[in-house]
Structures are given as structure tokens and as C-alpha cells.
Amino acid sequence: MTQHFIVIGNPIAHSKSPEIHTLFGTQAGLDICYQRQYCPDDAASFTAVIEAFFHGGGVGANVTVPFKQIAYECCAARGGLSEHAKVAGAVNTLLLNKALLAKGVPPVEALFGDNTDGQGLVNHMQRLGWPLNGARVAIIGAGGAARGVVLPLIEAGIETLSIANRTVSKAEILVDELSTASEKINQHTIQTYATADLSGDFDIIINATSIGLSGETLPLTDKLNCQYAYDMMYGRELPFLQHFSIRGAQTSDGYGMLIGQAALSFERWTGRAIDVAQATTALENVST
Amino acid sequence: MTQHFIVIGNPIAHSKSPEIHTLFGTQAGLDICYQRQYCPDDAASFTAVIEAFFHGGGVGANVTVPFKQIAYECCAARGGLSEHAKVAGAVNTLLLNKALLAKGVPPVEALFGDNTDGQGLVNHMQRLGWPLNGARVAIIGAGGAARGVVLPLIEAGIETLSIANRTVSKAEILVDELSTASEKINQHTIQTYATADLSGDFDIIINATSIGLSGETLPLTDKLNCQYAYDMMYGRELPFLQHFSIRGAQTSDGYGMLIGQAALSFERWTGRAIDVAQATTALENVST
């Protein structure tokens, strides 16, 4: 029997998820149908579209911009949230809470939310062989993308964490909120800076801003160094990566994070682990 | 495998369709799940909700106020419309055009629209034993409800048809549009009147207005008589029926039409005919 999945967003035509998950389905030998699902940008429409999908017998949904926070609210009021989703304050993966279904709770009341973005980043770095355990890490950006990776990074054993943002107060607020939301995070001292003041040596620096979209560049000082530089963006020239590659750092864009988070969602839905290295190679052949 | 259905409307909490179709499923021995589906009142939300439902593997959807015209537009641009839906200019039943699916057309492009409201009325009258063949029929009202029953009545062999409306011009416009939309209707001369001017003897008079909701009464003259009076409304006191029952007419409200249109939708989706008399009795036991 075909298992049905969607990725819901607005806009959505550009999403690569259908091709990625269709390849996963082939790799896992499962009959799946994964499609893009447009939705008007309001909470009532999102809830209605998600309800209709799960009413129809859908198995799982990915959630992308602008619905990750709305999905969070939806699940918080129904079937619950994973710890990563709770701390991230956002959901990118929807499924049905099987325990609740078994108790006869209707599908739409059993909606459960997870967030695999952060773990997808960590898994990609580990595949790259970057030394997360004991690492001195800096994240540039204090929005949703940054929020989603802090806990997974801490769980991966990093030593120290700094968060920098154009306006430092936003970074401070993020740290306060995260420390309240998670005891694990609360045990870490997280330094905060204005981006222009971030300096010194780090093992890993992560660009969690969408500045790559606008062609602007980050105000990075020359006194800022790292061994590894990661930009969550992909599919375009990334000045952030160039800045550090000419200074001898190893760099990576976020395409592997995209595959990583997708593989984790797929596993969440089907219980089947994906050989991400093999899938990435296969996808690169598809997309070139 | 569970077959999934929804009724989509706004508001929708009041809909009786889930109970009706669940009973049909039991009667037909099919594993079905039929649920109410709220949707924000705009075309983009409706299209997104319907797409998500069929993406999820949904089999069929009923459409009620305020989406019947939007559903019509949706299907006209995709998998097509039945003749009844085309002439009614509205869709109450959505399914997937199997011929298109077989050609690899994706579900959302194979969306097919039917309208079973009018035939549901005709079938109910025939169950009541009312003599449609050769009947002189009058319809009061010139909105969507009236529009949906003209072709089925003509196909049932009525002799003459008059359409009355508070403002007669609306009835005239309806007749013009219907005659253009259907050759069968075009061959009939349909008289039009202001409701207050409708008089003489009819076999059947149908109230296709929603005046029953507001508690107002229709401006019916004493020179208007009929053997059978039908009000499409149900579930409340209906002054229209009282007006004619005290004048010796046989009367019926529209509950049987609701069951009739549902049975036709069910048959459209599953290929299984429903024993409507048996179902109606069973439902009356459920609802009392």
C-alpha cells in the first residue's frame, strides 16, 4: 500500500524534498508518494490542510517556511512535541502519535511534531569528519535556524558555544529562552556577541543567517578564525564560505544538512534508516 | 484498507454526512472513515485542503456551503465535471478521474466534480411515490438549490416547469443560463413569475429557498394549489409545508434529499448502491 507524504510550505514549488524522499523510498524498497503541498499563509489554512491530509490517510508531513511555528502550536495543543521540537520552538516533521491513536484518539488530535533540522546538521558534520566532541563552536544568527541547532550541538559534546548576531540583544534573548527551555542547555555558559565583535579562534563557525540570499556579507573581523566553516544555505555562491576558505578553513554548505534532516524524518515515519552517503551521491547524479 | 472521505465546508460542525456515510459503509460492508473538514472561506485554502486530502490518499470528498462553486471551478480546470455538475454550476461530490489517473495524471490534476443534489431530490420524490412523469412542477427560488434540480426533474419526465422568485428577473436569468448550458433544458418552455404572482394548479411545488432558516414566510397567494409540496430544508418547523398541508397536500421536508444525494455520492465513490429506505430508517433510529 502506498504511503503518502507531503512537504507543506508557501512558496513550495522550489522544494527538493520530493526528489530526496522518493530516492529514499527506492533505497528502502518502500512504496511511497511524497508531494509538494501549497498552503495559504495563515494558521487556519495550515491546520485545515494538515487535517485534510491526515484525514485522507497521509502518513507524514514535512513543514517548511512559513509554517514551522504554526505547526509547533498545532502539535503542542494535540499529540505533543519531541524535545528537539520543544527547544527549537518549531516543527519540521509531522506524524501521528501512535500511542494516542491506539487509545482511539482521532488522527487530527494525535498530531505529533518533531524537528530534525539541528540533528541533520550535526549528522552532516559527523559524516564530514568534523570534530564536534570538545569543539569550540560559534553560531552567527539568532533566528529559528540558530535556535534549532543549539541542543543537538550540545548533545554532540561540543565544549563551548558562542552566539553572535547583528543586534546582540537578540542573541541574549535567544540564550535566555533556550536555557529556560532545556536543562541541558542551561548547564552551558553560552557567550553572546554582536557579529562585528566576534573574534578569536574557533574550531567550527556556523552561519545560521539567510544573508546568503541577499548577496550582502557578514561584518566578520580579520581576528576571527576557524578550522571548519559551515553555511546552512546551499545551491549558490556563499561569501561566508569564501571568507574562511581563503583563510585555510575546510568549508561546507548546507546541502548535506538538507539530506540529513530528510533522512531523519524518513526514519521517524517509516522506521527505516537511510544510507545518507549513498543517497547523497545518487541525488548529486540526479541534480546535475 | 480503510477508504477515507471528508465533507468540506465552513461551518462544518453541524454536518450530518459523517453519520450517514458511516452507516452506508456498515450497510455495504466497507471499511470507511468519513470526517468533517473545516476550511477557511477562500479559494486558495479550499484548493490546498482538497489537494492535501487527495495527496494523502483520500478517495472522495463531499463539498458543502460555501465551496460548491469554488469546487466547480477547481474541477473545470482539472479532471472535469459531470453533466449535472456543469448545468448546476456547482459541485457537491469530488472524486478522482480514474481514466486520467491511469494515464499517469497526478491526483490533484485528475479532480472530477459531480453534483448529486438534484438527483437526490428526484430519487426521494420517487421513493415517496410522487408522480414526476407528466407532472406540472413549480420551483420557488432561483439560487443554487433551484439551479441544481432543474435538469434532474426534466430527465425524470416532468411535463411543465415554472420558476418563481421574489424578484422575477433572477428567475429569468436562471432560465436563460440553464437553457444555454443544457440542450435538454433548452427544449422545455420554462415559465417565470414573481413568487407573489405564482397561481393555479400544480402537481408538485418545491421550495428551493432558505427562507425556512429565517422564520419569514413566502408571499403565497390563495389561488396557488398543489397535490404535493416539498421543502428542501429539514430539521425544523417549515411554514411552507404547513401552508399546503392545511390545504390537503401531501408534504415532505428535505431530509430524504440529504440521504438521497449522499447515497449517490457513496455509489459514485465505491460503486456500491445503497438501500436508501433501509438506511433512512436506521438513521432515524440513530438521530432520535
Swiss-Prot record, chains A, B:
Give the record's pathway: Metabolic intermediate biosynthesis; chorismate biosynthesis; chorismate from D-erythrose 4-phosphate and phosphoenolpyruvate: step 4/7
What organism, scientifically named, is this protein from? Psychrobacter cryohalolentis (strain ATCC BAA-1226 / DSM 17306 / VKM B-2378 / K5)
The protein's GO terms of the molecular function aspect are:
NADP binding; shikimate 3-dehydrogenase (NADP+) activity
- Tell me the enzyme class: oxidoreductase
Q: What does this protein do?
A: Involved in the biosynthesis of the chorismate, which leads to the biosynthesis of aromatic amino acids. Catalyzes the reversible NADPH linked reduction of 3-dehydroshikimate (DHSA) to yield shikimate (SA).
**The keyword Nucleotidyltransferase belongs to this UniProt entry's keyword annotation:** no
The family line of this record is: Belongs to the shikimate dehydrogenase family.
- Record: residues binding NADP(+): E83, G141, A142, G143, G144, A145, N165, R166, T167, V168, S169, K170, M232, G254
Gene name per UniProt: aroE
Any idea what this protein is called? Shikimate dehydrogenase (NADP(+))
- Gene Ontology terms: biological process: amino acid biosynthetic process; aromatic amino acid family biosynthetic process; chorismate biosynthetic process; shikimate metabolic process
Catalytic positions?
A: K68
User: Subunit structure, briefly?
Assistant: Homodimer.
